[in-house]
Regions:
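ABC ATPase NBD coupling module
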Residues: 80-94, 130
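Conserved ABC ATPase signature
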Residues: 128, 153-157, 161
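Catalytic Walker B motif of ABC-type/P-loop ATPase nucleotide-binding domains
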Residues: 178-182
Length: 212
């Protein structure tokens, strides 16, 4: 799929996964992003580098359809942000970030933290899940080396364990695009190396989503 986007003078040929054209974000007197043009093709793996305050998190929040730019055009998985129901689009994008992690109840079991992503919610309410949902959640936890923690309360986990649970949650909906916002932040050297190794395995999987 190739779609030519035009809006406010901006033009871009949108890839299957992600396309920014002339994207800027302004908050008060601060320009968080300035005229960003960027494309991510299917199967690509990207690493975004920059100092604190450079706009990395803002960029990923837009890519996850959780923020709109001040100016410019954003294409996500063949849809144009601002013309699509974001509640239908968001489940197609996996996001692991501090903004989501801080909303996870400490008293929720690890298994529930992951399986509730099926409904795009945080914390159990009155929804029900089938065996396939639980099997997928356990499979993801196992792939990330934390299946043995499924019955533990999220609030009792170490920072490294929480990071892996967050990634499992982000993968629960089988997303077409996976966004990881500073996945190794707060980890010691050993925890960072372990997480990077597991992400490396994910990145090498030809069936895995585009990864940023």
């Amino acid at each position: 799929l190739k779609v030519e986007l035009r809006k406010g003078g901006h033009k871009v040929t949108m890839s299957d996964v992600l396309a920014f054209a002339g994207v800027s974000v302004v908050r008060g007197q601060n320009r968080l992003l300035d005229d960003v043009t960027w494309e991510v093709e299917e199967g690509e793996r990207w690493v975004i580098l920059g100092p604190n305050g450079a706009g990395k998190t803002t960029l990923l929040q837009i890519a996850a359809a959780r923020m709109h730019p001040t100016t410019g055009v954003v294409g996500i998985l063949g849809e144009v942000l601002g013309t699509v129901d974001v509640f239908e689009l968001r489940p197609r994008v996996g996001l692991a970030s501090a903004s989501i992690a801080e909303r996870i109840p400490g008293g929720e079991s690890v298994g529930n933290v992951v399986v509730t992503a099926s409904y795009g919610i945080i914390g159990r309410w009155r929804e029900s899940y089938d065996r396939q949902d639980y099997a997928r959640a356990m499979g993801l936890l196992d792939a990330l080396g934390v299946a043995h923690l499924a019955d533990r309360l999220y609030g009792t986990l170490s920072e490294g364990e929480r990071k892996r649970v967050q990634i499992a949650r982000a993968l629960m909906t089988d997303p077409e695009l996976m966004l990881l916002d500073e996945p190794a932040a707060g980890l010691d050297l050993g925890g960072r190396e372990d997480l990077v190794a597991r992400l490396g395995v994910l990145a090498e999987d030809t069936e895995a989503p585009a990864l940023v």
